[in-house]
Amino acid sequence: MKRSACLPLLLAAVLLCSCGSNAKKAPERASLTSEERQFATPSDGDPIAIFTTSLGEVRAVLYPDAAPMAVYNFVGLARTGYYDNTIIWRSQYGFAVQGGDATGTGTGGSTIWSNNPYPLEADASLKHYAGALCAAFAQGGEVSGGNSQFYFVAALPDSVSSSDQQAELTQNGYTDAQVAAYAGAGGLPYLDNTDTVFGQVYQGMDVVDAMACVETTKDENGNDTWRPTEDAAITIEKVEITTYPGPAAAAEEEGSVG
């Protein structure tokens, strides 16, 4: 991610998050029927990542066919435990939540190639819809390509709701299905072709939204740093790489009989 975005207005129907003095509101996300691959149920055997965090579990399907280097790097690091007990260092409401930097500063990161970055892998079939799992550059642009850092798109459902926005997408060559998906799910279309999308959340988007509305710190000028406060810190306890459907979620196991 190279820049922040102006936050759009929130939908009227929302849920209140417990986020301290600067409480924010998490959106109600309707299920979306779309022919776009990012909204399809994963197929048995598809590679997935299970993020166990201090706020709950997030599951994302990975796309090695479209972003092979990003997926290979992410999977390789996850299997070494690189992401275990790291933090979400950026929680930008209406935009994204970002982690994957073992230093916790947002300026670090690593790769499986002796920290050498990998190039952009922009695939026309993958867009920055809400819930997209994306590779990110280190903050400040010191790195000339991707590394271990990643972010979940947490754009609000109405972020691409205006007819002017949708008309602009059409003029820029987006298909009707892509425009409809952005209109229904929200997203960050201006990041398309600038960052690599390598996965999509299919379970736990409510957890992503909870991450995005935690209390964050302000700098000496009163500007939001988008960094969670110490009391609101979010830990990525572990990232497990497996195949769909994966193990049952903890809540399902606790509620099972026999």
Feature names for model-found ranges:
Residues 2-3, 152:
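Residue-level detector of alpha-helical hydrophobic segments embedded in or interacting with membranes
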Residues 19-258:
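Cyclophilin-like peptidyl-prolyl cis-trans isomerases
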Residues 3-22:
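Sec-dependent N-terminal signal peptides of Gram-positive bacterial secreted proteins and lipoproteins
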